């Protein structure tokens, strides 16, 4: 029953505010009326929602200062959003949490940079070794005795049948 009475009270206050605004502003076509009514409605809703919440929070919480601070910051941020500002009010706790998050991210990125730098150094060393192996060295006299294509040279006399097996022979094909 208390909730119903509270709801009726809330509706009657909103109706009273609207009636008061209509009586103050005679011109019904005034451009700012919806904005004023919206702001007053939001303020009244915040008032009705925050007071019971604050009472319950203060009774159940051990640290009432933090609860009040958090509620005030939330209310101020809500009003700033309604006014169209993108900035928000933050507490020291939130700033410290954001700083911790930023520091963790910076450490993670530094570790990644360190790993990448180590890999790049290893790749440069590998490329240097490959370059050193591929570099042409000048030789004064070339020893052809060690070439693999010079080992199995046969003369015509050394072949088994006495004729060159690589010479083309006459081939006949059926048509």
From Swiss-Prot:
Transmembrane segment boundaries: 29-51
Q: Does the keyword Phosphoprotein apply?
A: no
Glycosylated residues, chain numbering: 8, 18
Stated role: Plays an essential role in the virus replication cycle by acting as a viroporin. Creates a pore in the host endoplasmic reticulum and as a consequence releases Ca(2+) in the cytoplasm of infected cell. In turn, high levels of cytoplasmic calcium trigger membrane trafficking and transport of viral ER-associated proteins to viroplasms, sites of viral genome replication and immature particle assembly.
Residues binding Ca(2+), per UniProt: 120, 123
- Tell me how this protein sits in the membrane: Single-pass type III membrane protein
Pull the Cytoplasmic topological domain ranges from the record: 52-175
Q: Which GO terms describe its molecular function?
A: channel activity; metal ion binding; toxin activity
> Highest taxon of the source?
Viruses
Q: Where in the cell is it found?
A: Host rough endoplasmic reticulum membrane; Host membrane, Host caveola; Secreted
> Pfam families, from UniProt?
Rota_NSP4
State the Gene3D superfamilies in the record: 1.20.5.430
Report the source organism.
Answer: Rotavirus A (strain RVA/Pig/United States/OSU/1977/G5P9[7]) (RV-A)
Note what the entry says on domains: Binds 1 calcium ion per tetramer.
GO term, biological process aspect, one: monoatomic ion transmembrane transport
Q: Its family?
A: Belongs to the rotavirus NSP4 family.
Q: Which residues lie on this side of the membrane: Lumenal?
A: 1-28
Entry's Gene Ontology cellular component terms: extracellular region; host caveola; host cell rough endoplasmic reticulum membrane; membrane
**Name the record gives this protein:** Non-structural glycoprotein 4
Q: Please describe the post-translational modifications of this protein.
A: The N-glycosyl content is primarily Man(9)GlcNAc, with a small amount of Man(8)GlcNAc.
Which UniProt keywords are given for this protein, alphabetically ordered?
A: Activation of host autophagy by virus, Calcium, Enterotoxin, Glycoprotein, Host endoplasmic reticulum, Host membrane, Host-virus interaction, Ion channel, Ion transport, Membrane, Metal-binding, Secreted, Signal-anchor, Toxin, Transmembrane, Transmembrane helix, Transport, Viral ion channel, Virulence
SUBUNIT field: Homotetramer. Interacts with the immature particle in the viroplasm. Interacts with host CAV1, early and late in infection. Interacts with host integrin ITGA1/ITGB1 heterodimer. Interacts with host integrin ITGA2/ITGB1 heterodimer. Interaction with microtubules blocks trafficking to the Golgi apparatus.
């Amino acid at each position: 029953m208390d909730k119903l009475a509270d709801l009726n009270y809330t509706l009657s206050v909103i109706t009273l505010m609207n009636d008061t605004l209509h009586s103050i502003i005679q011109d019904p076509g005034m451009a700012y009326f919806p904005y004023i009514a919206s702001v007053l409605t939001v303020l009244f809703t915040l008032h009705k929602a925050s007071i019971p919440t604050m009472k319950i929070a203060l009774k159940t919480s051990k640290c009432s200062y933090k609860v009040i601070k958090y509620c005030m910051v939330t209310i101020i941020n809500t009003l700033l959003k309604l006014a169209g500002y993108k900035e928000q009010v933050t507490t020291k706790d939130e700033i410290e949490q954001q700083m911790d998050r930023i520091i963790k991210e910076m450490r993670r990125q530094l570790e990644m940079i360190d790993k990448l730098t180590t890999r790049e150094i290893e790749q440069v060393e590998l490329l240097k070794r490959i370059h050193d192996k591929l570099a042409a060295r000048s030789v004064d006299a070339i020893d052809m005795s060690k070439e693999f294509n010079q080992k199995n040279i046969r003369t015509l006399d050394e072949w088994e049948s006495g004729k060159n097996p690589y010479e083309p022979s006459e081939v006949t094909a059926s048509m």
